[in-house]
Regions:
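Acidic, low-complexity proline/glycine/alanine-rich linker and hinge segments
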Residues: 1-38, 75-78, 98
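Glycine-centered small-residue hotspots that permit tight backbone geometry or close packing
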Residues: 2-6, 68, 89
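A short, well-structured alpha-helical segment
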Residues: 31-43, 50-86, 93, 97
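Hydrophobic beta-strand positions in extracellular immunoglobulin-like domains
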Residues: 48-50, 102
Length: 105
Protein backbone atom coordinates (compact mmCIF):
# COMPACT_ATOMS: atom_id res chain seq x y z
CA UNK A 1 0.00 0.00 0.00
CA UNK A 2 2.84 2.59 -0.15
CA UNK A 3 3.39 5.64 2.01
CA UNK A 4 1.91 9.07 2.60
CA UNK A 5 -1.79 8.45 3.00
CA UNK A 6 -2.07 5.87 0.26
CA UNK A 7 -0.63 8.06 -2.49
CA UNK A 8 1.39 6.16 -5.06
CA UNK A 9 1.09 2.69 -3.54
CA UNK A 10 3.29 0.37 -5.58
CA UNK A 11 5.35 3.21 -7.06
CA UNK A 12 9.10 3.26 -6.51
CA UNK A 13 11.14 6.15 -5.18
CA UNK A 14 14.25 7.14 -7.13
CA UNK A 15 17.46 5.66 -5.74
CA UNK A 16 18.58 2.19 -4.71
CA UNK A 17 18.76 0.99 -8.30
CA UNK A 18 15.69 2.91 -9.50
CA UNK A 19 16.40 5.61 -12.11
CA UNK A 20 14.39 8.81 -12.42
CA UNK A 21 11.91 9.26 -15.27
CA UNK A 22 13.20 11.64 -17.96
CA UNK A 23 10.81 14.27 -19.37
CA UNK A 24 10.47 14.06 -23.17
CA UNK A 25 7.38 16.29 -23.63
CA UNK A 26 7.12 19.14 -21.17
CA UNK A 27 5.02 22.13 -22.30
CA UNK A 28 5.01 25.23 -20.10
CA UNK A 29 1.75 25.88 -18.23
CA UNK A 30 -0.26 29.00 -19.09
CA UNK A 31 -0.64 31.80 -16.57
CA UNK A 32 -4.01 32.26 -14.89
CA UNK A 33 -5.59 35.63 -15.66
CA UNK A 34 -5.77 36.41 -11.94
CA UNK A 35 -2.03 35.78 -11.41
CA UNK A 36 -1.06 37.75 -14.53
CA UNK A 37 -3.04 40.80 -13.38
CA UNK A 38 -1.43 40.57 -9.92
CA UNK A 39 2.03 40.09 -11.53
CA UNK A 40 2.36 37.01 -9.32
CA UNK A 41 5.34 34.66 -9.74
CA UNK A 42 6.64 31.58 -7.97
CA UNK A 43 6.93 27.81 -7.98
CA UNK A 44 4.35 25.06 -7.51
CA UNK A 45 5.80 21.78 -6.22
CA UNK A 46 4.04 18.57 -7.29
CA UNK A 47 4.51 14.94 -6.30
CA UNK A 48 3.81 12.83 -9.39
CA UNK A 49 3.68 9.16 -10.29
CA UNK A 50 5.04 8.30 -13.74
CA UNK A 51 3.71 4.93 -14.92
CA UNK A 52 5.54 2.29 -16.97
CA UNK A 53 4.28 3.91 -20.20
CA UNK A 54 5.79 7.29 -19.25
CA UNK A 55 2.45 8.95 -18.47
CA UNK A 56 1.61 10.91 -15.32
CA UNK A 57 -0.80 8.51 -13.61
CA UNK A 58 -1.30 10.45 -10.38
CA UNK A 59 -0.25 13.73 -8.84
CA UNK A 60 -0.81 16.01 -5.92
CA UNK A 61 0.21 19.53 -4.98
CA UNK A 62 2.86 19.53 -2.24
CA UNK A 63 3.60 23.29 -2.19
CA UNK A 64 0.75 25.43 -3.58
CA UNK A 65 1.16 28.91 -5.01
CA UNK A 66 -2.45 30.09 -5.31
CA UNK A 67 -4.18 32.52 -7.69
CA UNK A 68 -5.19 29.67 -10.01
CA UNK A 69 -1.59 28.66 -10.74
CA UNK A 70 -1.83 25.33 -8.89
CA UNK A 71 -4.66 24.27 -11.21
CA UNK A 72 -2.74 25.42 -14.31
CA UNK A 73 0.32 23.43 -13.17
CA UNK A 74 -1.78 20.29 -12.53
CA UNK A 75 -3.62 20.52 -15.88
CA UNK A 76 -0.37 20.95 -17.81
CA UNK A 77 1.74 18.37 -15.97
CA UNK A 78 -0.96 15.74 -16.61
CA UNK A 79 -0.07 16.09 -20.34
CA UNK A 80 3.69 15.65 -19.83
CA UNK A 81 5.36 12.51 -21.22
CA UNK A 82 8.41 10.79 -19.76
CA UNK A 83 10.87 8.05 -20.52
CA UNK A 84 9.83 5.82 -17.56
CA UNK A 85 11.96 5.21 -14.50
CA UNK A 86 13.80 1.89 -14.56
CA UNK A 87 14.62 -0.79 -12.01
CA UNK A 88 16.95 -3.52 -13.26
CA UNK A 89 16.45 -2.13 -16.80
CA UNK A 90 12.67 -2.71 -16.54
CA UNK A 91 10.18 0.23 -16.55
CA UNK A 92 8.52 0.70 -13.15
CA UNK A 93 6.02 3.24 -11.80
CA UNK A 94 8.12 5.94 -10.18
CA UNK A 95 7.30 8.67 -7.65
CA UNK A 96 9.11 11.99 -8.22
CA UNK A 97 8.88 15.57 -6.99
CA UNK A 98 8.81 18.27 -9.67
CA UNK A 99 8.76 22.06 -9.62
CA UNK A 100 6.71 24.16 -12.02
CA UNK A 101 7.92 27.76 -12.07
CA UNK A 102 5.74 30.66 -13.16
CA UNK A 103 7.68 33.75 -14.21
CA UNK A 104 6.52 36.92 -15.93
CA UNK A 105 8.97 38.44 -18.41
Amino acid sequence: PGEGGGFGGGAYSVGGGVTAPIPIYKPEPPYSEEARKAKYQGTVVLLIIVDTQGNVSDLRVVKPLGLGLDEKAVETVRTWKFKPGLRNAVPVPTRVMIEVTFRLF
